[in-house]
From Swiss-Prot:
It comes from Mus musculus (Mouse). Disruption phenotype: Mutants are viable, fertile with no apparent defects. Mice are more susceptibility to colitis induced by dextran sodium sulfate (DSS) than wild type littermates. They display significantly increased tumor burden compared with WT mice assessed in colitis-associated colorectal cancer model induced by azoxymethane (AOM)-DSS. It holds the Pfam family DUF5917. PANTHER family: FHF COMPLEX SUBUNIT HOOK-INTERACTING PROTEIN 2B (PTHR21705:SF9), RAI16 PROTEIN-RELATED (PTHR21705). This is FHF complex subunit HOOK-interacting protein 2B.
Amino acid sequence: MLSRLGALLQEAVGAREPSIDLLQAFVEHWKGITHYYIESTDENTPAKKTDIPWRLKQMLDILVYEEKQQASSGEAGPCLEYLLQHKILETLCTLGKAEYPPGMRQQVFQFFSKVLSQVQHPLLHYLSVHRPVQKLLRLGGTVPGSLTEKEEVQFTSVLCSKIQQDPELLAYILEGKKIIGKKKTARESTAPPKDIAGYRDKDCPHSDALNRDPGLDKEHCGVPALSIHLPAETEGPENGPGESNLITSLLGLCKSKKSRLALKAQENILLLVSVASPAAATYLTQSTSCCMAIAEHLCQLYRSMPACLDPADIATLEGISWRLPSAPSDETAFPGKEALAAFLGWFDYCDHLITEAHTVVADALAKAVAEKLFVETLQPQLLHVSEQSILTSTALLTALLRQLRSPALLQEAMTFLLGTDQHPAAIEDSPHTLGTHLIMHCDHLSDEISIATLRLFEELLQKPHEQAIRSLVLQNLEGRLYVARGSPEPESYEDTLDLEEDPYFTDGFLDSGLQPSTKPPPAPATSSDGKTAVTEIVNSFLCLVPEEAKTSAFLEENGYDTYVHDAYGLFQECSSRVAHWGWPLGPAPLDSHEPERPFFEGRFLQVLFDRIARILDQPYSLNLQVTSVLSRLALFPHPHIHEYLLDPYISLAPGCRSLFSVLVRVIGDLMQRIQRVPQFSGKLLLVRKQLMGQVPGEHLDHQTLLQGVVVLEEFCKELAAIAFVKFPPHGPYLNFSPPPEGQV
């Protein structure tokens, strides 16, 4: 009974309520806004204290309500047609530019954003919409910290979302009137009849909706004098396209001091470059300065950093994310910390853009970053005569490589560092490439530069790209010219020399009275399972250092078990990284009829071997880095690398050296030096304890030599462990089960 009574009352009220003319209400609100400018004399009242925000809200609500009422027809309603035909958005854009009343620009940004997001009818194809959108974009993103930053970000977010849904809009928003002539025919063939009027430059076009009240039409046509006499800069872009206004606006917003707004702007650019349409992606790269602008901002951040940065300080910020680019507050402050964090964060962002972008955009952006940052900015610093410039730029490049993930940018980095020449290097070649200069820096007079450059190459070798290992090592090992012709293949070790018969090995023992820790027997033939051979090879490395020079046993920490388990994990990781490179399972067969040619290990291995040969005379930190790079190389599961670096029984061609033969010479030198150092064993044990932090680090005589001996012992154990997990050489991809603790 009550429900029936309520229904009757509602029906009675509805009968008395007059029907609302949406168009009339819409025009009345617009007239209210325009009359404010005619009648108001107060220039200081903020826009939010006038009735303008309320009237704009009513106009928006009318547009949304009208669209819901006409959802079945799919055509633009009278109010929307009125908005388009009378260039209301153009007029609002002009009012926003004038910033009168104060805060009007903020209201205009909000209205544009809400209309474009809440009205479902496609709008950005219309000239009377995308032209004011372009003009409004020019008003924002130019001054960091402006009062409208929040509204600008919301506005650009709506535009990027629309482009993501319809990539064809990209040309309208970025180029505008220039594109109209090219697309007019296609547009008119698909647009509804009532919509076509929206493209025409008429202030008062004829419309059935307006014909309901001729007085209303005439009255309105006299109202918007504001829109008839617009300033020249608000007219269509007659002098050329609006050059990437959305992009420049977004890049400006990325510089906002408000991290949330900057992050949202970066996410909007990410939406823009990941458009699915190949045509839109091509347009974005060829008809705009998008890629170059992003790369140029990266270079600006680089130039804003101090010229001199400590590599240790750079290392504290490695791995910084673009989503959290601010420097960690708990780290020690240093000059340029915030600038460095901003640079590394933007580089990570560029790398992420290239990863997520359409292939066309990714390639173009990668080339832009390579050209602007690598070639034009970093390369002069890397080749500079100033040691500080070399040191800082090398450390920064290492940090960039560590963050780099995108395949396209990785390819550009490889080409930048190593070039494209895949021919084996000759000893007489002049150092004409950047890569060759960097290799020479590994043997620089400055130990700091040598360490920093070795770290760079170690990072390079860990990237999932074959060009690094091929250019640095493999191309010089092809053909196995390091093996003496007529020598047996590596599967048979019967005729090889044992260590005491090696001419390199005996040099160090002449009249020394010292002997190696154990005498390895002549290498027997490899058994079917390879266990005999691996035992001999492992023992060859473990027995290199004489007992007088070993100290790890005195500290009850042999360390070999730990090396094996570490090597196993690193080898599995390396094997999975190179599995798809199609490497052979065994070494290339020797051609006995091929004339002998001189072998050159390549500049990279040459420098590393020269460095390891001076291990007893180099600083401890430098020795650690040299051995780290060599261990990283030895892990690669290529049969030629395995043979050249880890096979003690290889029969070397005349004049050639291998890693093992270099170590043998070092041991020979060590045995002669031991006799000249009083209380050698006691001092060596003390130095090891100092390095482990067990005793205070007081300075000792022959400290460099003693530290070098400790590194040498550990390096030999590490090589033995790597050989163990990699063997046999003819099947480096075999998956061995990890050895149990304590049973190695």
